[in-house]
Amino acid sequence: MARFDFLTTPIAGLTLVQRLRLEDSRGFLSRFYCADEFEAAGVQQSIVQINHTLTRCKGTVRGMHFQLPPHAETKFVSCLHGEVYDVAVDLRKSSSTFLQWHGVLLSAENQCSFLIPEGFAHGFQALTDDCELIYLHTAAYQPAAEGAVNANDPRLAITWPLDIAEMSDRDRSHPLLAAEFEGFEP
């Protein structure tokens, strides 16, 4: 029995993953990840790092982060508590959707995860207080390979659902994309 539905999005490579939730009087069981099922769906990368975040304030935006090659990473993002609007921006140089973004709603209730391949910037906005996310990464964090773009970059024109209540100084200071930005190949 399949425990996941892999749903396509308007941007090639971005996938919304719906986890099957089995419930009874005791509660529920939801398979979070299965390498065999992901491989059968064409996702064949090993998880090497897992991060867990808490965002306390509704309206907070985190992002937009990525890692440059040769440390580019795929992220599998899930919400364990609360609700977030999760966004990925296509930075792949040769992509027909270069600089386009796609957002999805992730929550503990909807049992969805966002599979974001190499070559995308990632960020989110907390839609409730005390949001907890878990990220599965296919590459370890490498500070020298870290990249970011400003979540309010007018060239991206991301439509955040709420007014931005909080953003770290670091995220707020990420650069706007220069007109000559051509992306990169993961």
Residue spans for each PLM region:
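Short beta-strand His + acidic residue motifs that chelate non-heme Fe in jelly-roll/DSBH
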Residues: 114, 122-127
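Compact nucleic-acid interaction/catalytic patches
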Residues: 124, 133-134
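Non-catalytic, conserved peripheral segments adjacent to functional cores
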Residues: 1-112, 130, 137, 142-186
